[in-house]
Amino acid sequence: LETKIESWATWKSNIVKLRDLTVEKEAATAMKFIMFTKHLEGLDIPGIMKALKSVGVEGADLCTRPGYPVNPDNVDRELPKVAKRFADEGLCIPLVTTPGDFISADIDYAERMYAGCGEAGVANIKLGYWHWRPDGPHYWEYVDTIRKELEEFSKLSEKYGPKTCIHTHSGRDMGLNSCSVMHLVKGFDPKYVGVFADTGHLSICGEPIDMALDIVKEYLSVMAFKDLMRRPGDRGGGVVRMGKGFVDWKLTLKTLKVMNFDGPVSFHSEYREPVETVIDLARIDVRFINGLLQEGIRD
């Protein structure tokens, strides 16, 4: 009888452990992994979908710049078709990246971009970049100008659905880190305006990653995963393989888990290599992050 009781207790304990492990695994994998298609330049839509499946992600951070299959000239017509083709292959497009000069709702294709994304079911639109210049407007005057532009973009978001997102990018970009990007977005409805936080850029000019993500927590909509490093004297940072740069990956993943972040994570894989090599390196990036997630589950 004692043996049976012990066996029952052991079995029950194992079931509880298995349940807890399943819950932790689901929490760790709630984020949706996608890949930035900028460096898949030259591939058509079938080629892009094949690459994404090879990398092991769920979809695309679709580059909608001139020269790509979906671009400002055809986005309202082509993006809904492409989204359907993606869905038929079990893939998704939760984010599009627009041209770097897409910083005004008055630009001729703004309405087309938002309408196309709305019809295609794309949840997030990454804007271009506002650059601070020594001979330009005073910083705070420029902040006011940008916020006026964001008011117009937020109206498009409210009308068509996709959220307007600002990417944290190092250098003299307005919104280069969490504190500065909050100067731009704070006060807007997080339903329509959000932050696209980039681990690499934050690592060279941002706050400690857990602090950085807490600062933008209310507006955090999308993450970019890449690693950067900067040597003394460098004007900017250089992309390196994940785990070789300044990003604290374990703290990043731990913080996102504590925050219950379940949004898209765009693997940027900005390696200046031939497309096939970029695909191979992106696959390694995904494997690297999955490995850390599994370590966290076991710990």
Describe the role of every protein-language-model region.
Residues 39-41, 64-66, 99-102, 129-133, ...:
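Active-site-proximal loop/turn and secondary-structure-junction residues that shape catalytic pockets
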Residues 69-72, 140-141, 237-243:
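Short glycine-enriched, charge-decorated loop/helix-capping segments at active-site entrances
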Residues 61, 95, 126, 165, ...:
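Conserved beta-strand positions in the central sheet of alpha/beta enzyme cores
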Residues 46-51, 85-89, 102-195, 204, ...:
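Active-site acidic/histidine proton-transfer and metal-coordination neighborhood
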Residues 8-11:
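Tryptophan (W) side chains
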Residues 18, 22-37, 41-58, 83, ...:
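Histidine-acidic metal/acid-base catalytic patches
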Residues 61-83, 132-137:
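Glycine-rich, proline-tolerant flexible connector loops at the mouths of alpha/beta enzymes
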Residues 32-43, 97-107, 136-142, 241:
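Active-site mouth loops of central-metabolism enzymes
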